[in-house]
Amino acid sequence: VIIVAVVLAVVLLCCVGVAGGGFLLYRTVSAATEPARDATTAHFDALSAGDYAGAYQRLCQDRRDTLSETEYVRQESAAGQIAGYDIVGVNVSTTNGRTSGTVTVEVTYDGGAQRQEAVRLVEENGEWRVCQ
């Protein structure tokens, strides 16, 4: 009876450890990816609302240096109105001290056309910005 109790205790501890470790891993990954997801959501919310100037302000500095707000608004207006979108994947990495990410977004346009986009982001001064 004592052996069975010890075995059950060990099994229980292992299960709790695996569950706890899994939860900790989930929270760590979530903490790393949520800011990139949130920045992408804010960007696509602005695009969906037709707020192209607001979406432009969410772009990284490199992109804003090479593309004027007027040109960006013209390009996005010509691309068609976004009816909806779903974020289907988030990947974040740090290389040589520079943190970047890619968020995969399935975009649906008015009229039903769909396209999957790999949205590149960079972290600038503690903020995530779309850089494409």
Which sequence ranges carry the predicted segments?
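Short, low-complexity N-terminal intrinsically disordered segments enriched in polar/charged residues
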Residues: 2-45
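Functionally engaged cysteine thiol sites
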Residues: 13-15, 60-62, 129-131
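Extracytoplasmic/periplasmic, Sec-exported soluble proteins
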Residues: 31-36, 44-48, 64-67, 109-113, ...
